């Protein structure tokens, strides 16, 4: 496609006013409707706009709490992932014990090996299914966990502390 040599901005809310059934009726969408959109420019390719799109659609909400004796310094991350196209989609306490569950989603469509870095030692990593049933114990431990992800994979891991 050719690039426009002029700025293009068209903020139109598209909506359908006809039922999705082939013989469906027309209907009115009464009430107040609102939408938001974010505008930016980036180099060609979806990978260049992906971080902005994710950040725009998932704002970061901070809730300040009183420190109750935690030892993690304010300058450190709780968790780092080496690949920008691997999403941490879940982090929580395991249902059956006091260990940590993380769920990673590979967003780029490529098989890859990533590194998850934590500020504490992990004794063992166990791959689980979505309902935390243990599937496979991995030969991984320490503060840096090297994990393999398949293309478009959604993997859940139990981190034994």
Where do the model's predicted regions map?
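Terminal accessory/anchoring regions of large secretory-pathway or extracellular enzymes
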Residues: 1-161
